[in-house]
């Protein structure tokens, strides 16, 4: 990837995304998202902090750098304290801040990935996790199984509202390294690509 002008950050992100995507027990029906926070140089010669997050239409198992569109990070973070944002406003804002406007639409979970203050964020719809969370007493089971490093969140529809909820949960529990959203899936995060991937495997195995 270096020969093609891509950074080590991007190479690691592509590699671990493929690892997750090729595990059918982790990614149901192609679902899941990954991201990396890094810097890129635009045509104006300036370096921008960006969030490269999986774009719509891309399969994690076969992801390429082009499937992780770069969105300017600071404009995303500028909305951190905004209470509400409609789906239409959210999509338009994300597209407006793409480095390359021809890139695929960024994930509906873009703000969620931006608000978690870690370089690498992984999200999957693991069937093992779902088998625990989808029970009537899912929260109780999750707390027993996963311990204090994991926060359990009742289901919120993916979008800006979920991003705000996860931001609030993380601020109250800054020592966590995993979030489980009932009836949806699991998020792991770290400043190290391997650690974020390993955490995903660990918690799914625990389930």
What label would you give each PLM region?
Residues 1-207:
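Glycine-rich flexible loops
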């Amino acid at each position: 990837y270096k020969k093609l002008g891509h950074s080590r950050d991007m190479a690691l992100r592509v590699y671990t995304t493929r690892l997750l995507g090729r595990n059918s027990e982790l990614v149901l029906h192609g679902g899941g998202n990954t991201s990396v926070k890094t810097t890129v140089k635009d045509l104006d010669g300036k370096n921008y902090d960006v969030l490269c997050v999986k774009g719509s239409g891309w399969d994690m198992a076969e992801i390429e750098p082009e499937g992780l569109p770069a969105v300017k990070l600071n404009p995303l973070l500028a909305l951190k304290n905004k209470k509400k944002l409609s789906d239409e406003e959210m999509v338009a804002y994300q597209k407006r801040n793409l480095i390359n406007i021809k890139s695929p639409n960024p994930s509906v979970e873009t703000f969620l990935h931006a608000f978690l203050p870690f370089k690498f964020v992984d999200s999957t719809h693991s069937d093992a996790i779902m088998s625990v969370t989808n029970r009537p007493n899912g929260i109780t089971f999750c707390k027993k199984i996963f311990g204090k490093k994991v926060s359990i969140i009742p289901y919120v529809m993916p979008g800006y509202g979920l991003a705000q909820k996860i931001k609030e949960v993380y601020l109250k529990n800054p020592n966590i390294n995993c979030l489980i959203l009932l009836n949806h899936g699991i998020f792991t995060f770290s400043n190290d690509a391997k650690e974020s991937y390993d955490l995903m495997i660990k918690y799914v195995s625990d389930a």
